[in-house]
């Protein structure tokens, strides 16, 4: 099947699976590597070069898609793509999106932190039809994922990356049947989660160390914020332990080299990699 692929590095294994399954990639859409929300497309650009596939960095226009359909493009596949794909008739071509939650729960650009924070039942992968509203199209296939007690953003991302290519392969292998049997999403069960910011992404030193580590794991290398000594900082890597102390939560208990130890409710938190905000 002739496919147009929209995506970034995180789902590059899906592109490789499509090629391995014999599908023809006629164009790849990605975006400049300094894009603020999705900053990893170097491998996608390299893959396009190796496959000798035309690549575009612009936002696609409706006329571009119509021209591709006229040139016999049959499927438009979106996976961690930064821009909205213009609508086109499903009678002319298939439009699919890969989403990192069990829809209809967890609509939105980045559901993984919320899944890890308080919604483990939404962990999974969904492939759905492109629709006018983001993440609202009928479901073609999905698979749930189990979370471990110490699941973090990196491990959940890895599980999703491993689960998605075979799921996509199955859909593409019998796309007409999957399309005909697609299940509309239950709007009464739907939830839309904005990109977490503010309090949701900020450590609270008055909490216990278990809660602090839980929030850190939900964001991992994408970092959480915290206030230390009156300054806002971004924290990339921490450790923590329970220990009795008499310090006020948020107090700097120790400072050495570039690391800080901060008092929490029932223990201490070691900031191993952190950066001044701004």
Whereabouts are the PLM-identified features?
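Extracellular/luminal ectodomains and secreted, surface-exposed scaffolds of diverse proteins
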Residues: 249-253
